Amino acid sequence: MTKEDWEAVIGLEVHAQVSSNTKLFSSSSTEFGAEHNTQVSLVDAAMPGTLPILNYYCIEQAIRTGLALSAEINKYSYFDRKNYFYPDLPQGYQITQFFEPIVKNGRVFINDNEKEIRIARIHLEQDAGKSVHEESKTYVDLNRAGVALMEIVSEPDLRSSAEAAECMKKLRQILRYIGSCDGDMEKGSLRCDANVSVRLKGSSTFGTRCEIKNLNSIRYIVQAIDYEIQRQIEILESGEEISQDTLLFDVASGKTKVMRSKEDASDYRYFPEPDLLPVEVSQDKIDLIQSSLPELPDQKKLRYIEELGINEYDANVITSDKAIADYFEELIKKHDSKLAVTWLTVELFGRLNKAGIDIVSSPIKANALSELLDFIVDGTISAKLGKQVFDSMFETGKPASLIIEEQGLKQITDRGQISEVIDKIINNNQDKVQEYKSGKTKLYGFFVGEVMKLTKGKASPDVVNSILSERLSN
C-alpha cells in the first residue's frame, strides 16, 4: 500500500482566550506580560473558603461566538469539575462545561465555502497556570490560572493538515471580527489540540486517534499533523497497532512525542460544580447579542464583490483581517472603491511588507491616506507625485498637506502658465513637431516628458494633454 491508500481523519479542539479584562471566576487582571504571580486572587490560588463568582461577560462572548458560527445556544447550561493533578492547577480540578455546554451544533466553512466543518460544541473553562523551568528548579506562575477560555470543538471532518490550517485561520478570522478573542497565537490567546487518526480510503470506521497538544502556530499545526499522519501509516503498514496517546510536538525535531497515554472522560471523574449556579439565558438576551454582531467576513466579501465590483482575490485579501477591512471601509467613505483597493493593496501593502509590519502598526492611518487621495482626486497633486508624498508620509508620519506644502508639490493647473511652457518646448523642437505631424505619433510622449521636466512634475496631466493635443494638431 502507498500513502494515497490512506485517509486522515482530523478534529480540532481550539482554545480561544476570551477578550475580557478580568478572569472567568475572579476580578484579577488578564493583562499579558505582567510579572510572575502579580495577577492572582485568592480564588485563583484556590485558598480554602474562597468561592468563584462568574464573569457574565464571558458568557456573552461565548454566545456571541456561537451565533457567529450559526450554532445553537443552550438556554440552560452549567459548569463541572474536571479532576486531575498538575503543579500549575492549584485547585486540583478545572472548572469547565462537560455535560451541558453553552453552545452546540455550529459550523464553519473552508475551501472557498465549499466544505462545511461541523462544530460540535463550545464550552467555557478556566485556564491553568504555567510551569517555568530554570536549570534544576521549576517555578509556578499563576497569572494565567483562571483566565477564561472558550474551547471550540470540531467534529472529525478535516482530512488533511491544509484543511486543519484553513479551519484554524477561518475561526481566528471570525473571532477577531466579532471581538470575542484577539487571536494572538504568539501570546497564547489562541492555540489548539489536534486529534489525528488514519484509515483506509473508503472505510467508515474510525482509527485509533492520538491527540497532539498545545499547537500555537499555523505552521506547527501543519507540521505536527503531517508527521503524525505519516507515523501512524508506517505503524499500521508494519502490522502494529496505534496506541491511543497524548502527544507533544517537538519543534526542533519536527516530530511528535508521547506525553502520556490518552485519558477517557471517566478518568477525570466529572461532576457538576457545586459552587456555581446553572447559567440560564433568555431568548431576548440571545436576540440582543445576535443584533449586535458585525458584518462577518464572508458577508463582507460577498458585498465587496457584488456591490463594489471588487475582484474575488482583492476581496479575499481585504476581508482576511478585520483591521484591513476597517481601514478599507474608512477609505471608501469618500473615495471610489477601485482607487482605494489600488492604494491599499499595492502602495500601502508593498511598503508594509518591506518594513515587516502589519496594518495596525502602519505609520499611515486610514484618515491620512484618505486625505492624500483627496489631493489626488481634486487635482492638487498628480498620482505620480502622490506616490512621492506617500513615501514621505510613510517615513515621517507627517500628513499629506504638510508634505505638499514643505516640498512645494502643489500641482500647476493654470492653463496660461502651462501654455507658456508648452509653447517654449514646441518652439525649441520644431524638427520633432514636424516628425510628429508626419506620423511619428509616439513623439507625443517626448513633449509630455519635456513639460513635466520643466515643471518638475507639477503640471496637471489633464491640462497638459488638453493644451498639447490642441497645439500639435494645428
UniProtKB/Swiss-Prot annotation:
- Annotated EC: 6.3.5.-
* Molecular-function annotations in GO: asparaginyl-tRNA synthase (glutamine-hydrolyzing) activity; ATP binding; glutaminyl-tRNA synthase (glutamine-hydrolyzing) activity
Enzyme class, first EC level, given as a word: ligase
Q: Which Pfam families match?
A: GatB_N (PF02934), GatB_Yqey (PF02637)
In the UniProt record, does the keyword Nucleotide-binding occur?
yes
Question: Which of UniProt's keywords are assigned here?
Answer: ATP-binding, Ligase, Nucleotide-binding, Protein biosynthesis
Q: Does the keyword Nucleotide-binding apply?
A: yes
Task: Give the catalysed reaction(s), semicolon-separated.
Answer: L-glutamyl-tRNA(Gln) + L-glutamine + ATP + H2O = L-glutaminyl-tRNA(Gln) + L-glutamate + ADP + phosphate + H(+); L-aspartyl-tRNA(Asn) + L-glutamine + ATP + H2O = L-asparaginyl-tRNA(Asn) + L-glutamate + ADP + phosphate + 2 H(+)
- GO biological-process terms attached to the record: glutaminyl-tRNAGln biosynthesis via transamidation; translation
The role this protein plays is: Allows the formation of correctly charged Asn-tRNA(Asn) or Gln-tRNA(Gln) through the transamidation of misacylated Asp-tRNA(Asn) or Glu-tRNA(Gln) in organisms which lack either or both of asparaginyl-tRNA or glutaminyl-tRNA synthetases. The reaction takes place in the presence of glutamine and ATP through an activated phospho-Asp-tRNA(Asn) or phospho-Glu-tRNA(Gln).
Say which family it is in. Answer: Belongs to the GatB/GatE family. GatB subfamily.
Q: How does it assemble?
A: Heterotrimer of A, B and C subunits.
Q: What is this protein called?
A: Aspartyl/glutamyl-tRNA(Asn/Gln) amidotransferase subunit B
